């Protein structure tokens, strides 16, 4: 794969892989402004994609992004799809709208929507803890419902890809298979909830690749880098982050690591979309995986519970099927 500097920007990543953008269809979740998803969408618009679909809760949040895309290139088709990942009825409706709008052909799905370290214990409509719901379970359902469209594009020269945005926060906790919703809140911890959800997204990427790689679809889990410019952690204060290290140690017995190699502790807003874009576009990655990306490259997760293990991967898949009430077999 192409090697980039640790300070590579989203713009540079798109420029390097412009042929892998031109004429292709991308679906991005959670791309309200400002967010990692919106930065990715706006940069992709510079390289002449055929269609950018942004799935988010409210049109108001996405309108500035659609406007920015059209300013980049008025010929790029940009579509808003209403999606509430915490409501499975909404996910199913959104999937049908996306399939119709794309004529059942999607080249790249980027699952970038999410929430982080919510202080108040909350359940979604289905009774699932809200961080697990939005970060993982809703995306699991959406991705599987869109898989027929990904398989159609899998026949193209570049294949099809799914990018799950995870976080170094995965280190905080493994998936709590026997108690994903914290005993109705009695044992809830906001960072543990975030950690298990981000671990689940890694295991999901592994599981999807296991099932579909031979048919031309691969999924990668990506930590985009830490950044304070998006709305993701806007409800937190710096003291909240002091709980990350002891919570990780308590849950896993391991130390928490913020970076790998020469990765900056914080990436700029211009850099924050680069790693997922590299994973989505680099043609040398076709047929590769399962894999986890950080700092623009494939790395081994530092936490034992996120290293590929088929038993754990399949266990997460089965749990996710139970939570959405539907089996997906390929």
Residue ranges: model-predicted function:
Residues 147, 205-209, 276-277, 317, ...:
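Non-transmembrane alpha-helical segments in soluble domains
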Residues 92-95, 269-280, 310-317:
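Short, amphipathic alpha-helical "lid/cap" segments that border enzyme active or binding sites
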Residues 3-239, 330:
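Rossmann-fold NAD(P)H-dependent dehydrogenase/reductase core
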Residues 61, 130, 275-278, 289, ...:
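Residues within well-formed alpha-helices
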Residues 188-195, 259-266, 303-308:
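Active-site rim elements
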Residues 46, 280-284, 325:
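Residues at helix-coil transition
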Residues 6, 256, 285-330:
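C-terminal tail/cap regions
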Residues 210-288:
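SDR active-site lid
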């Amino acid at each position: 794969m192409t090697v980039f500097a640790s300070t590579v920007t989203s713009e540079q990543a798109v420029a390097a892989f412009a042929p892998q953008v031109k004429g292709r269809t991308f679906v991005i979740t959670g791309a309200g402004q400002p967010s990692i998803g919106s930065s990715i969408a706006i940069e992709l618009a510079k390289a002449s994609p055929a269609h950018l679909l942004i799935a988010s809760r409210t049109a108001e949040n996405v309108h500035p992004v659609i406007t920015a895309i059209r300013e980049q290139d008025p010929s790029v088709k940009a579509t808003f799809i209403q999606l509430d990942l915490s409501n499975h009825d909404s996910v199913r409706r959104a999937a049908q709208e996306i399939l119709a709008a794309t004529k059942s052909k999607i080249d790249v799905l980027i699952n970038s929507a999410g929430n982080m370290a919510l202080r108040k214990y909350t359940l979604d409509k289905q009774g699932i803890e809200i961080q697990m719901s939005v970060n993982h379970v809703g995306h699991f359902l959406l991705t599987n419902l869109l898989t027929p469209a990904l398989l159609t594009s899998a026949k193209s020269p570049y294949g099809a890809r799914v990018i799950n945005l995870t976080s170094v926060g995965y280190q905080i906790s493994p998936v709590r298979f026997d108690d994903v919703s914290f005993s109705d809140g009695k044992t809830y911890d906001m960072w543990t909830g975030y950690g298990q959800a981000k671990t689940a997204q890694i295991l999901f990427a592994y599981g999807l690749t296991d099932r579909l790689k031979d048919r031309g679809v691969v999924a990668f889990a990506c930590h985009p880098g830490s950044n304070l410019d998006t709305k993701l952690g806007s409800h937190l204060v710096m003291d909240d982050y002091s709980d990350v290290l002891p919570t990780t140690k308590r849950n896993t017995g391991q130390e928490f690591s913020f970076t790998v190699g020469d990765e900056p502790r914080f990436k700029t807003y211009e850099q924050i979309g680069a790693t997922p874009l590299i994973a989505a576009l680099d043609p040398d990655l076709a047929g590769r995986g399962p894999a986890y990306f950080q700092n623009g490259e494939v790395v081994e997760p530092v936490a034992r519970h996120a290293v590929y293990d088929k038993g754990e991967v399949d266990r997460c898949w089965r749990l996710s099927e139970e939570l959405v009430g539907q089996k997906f077999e390929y």
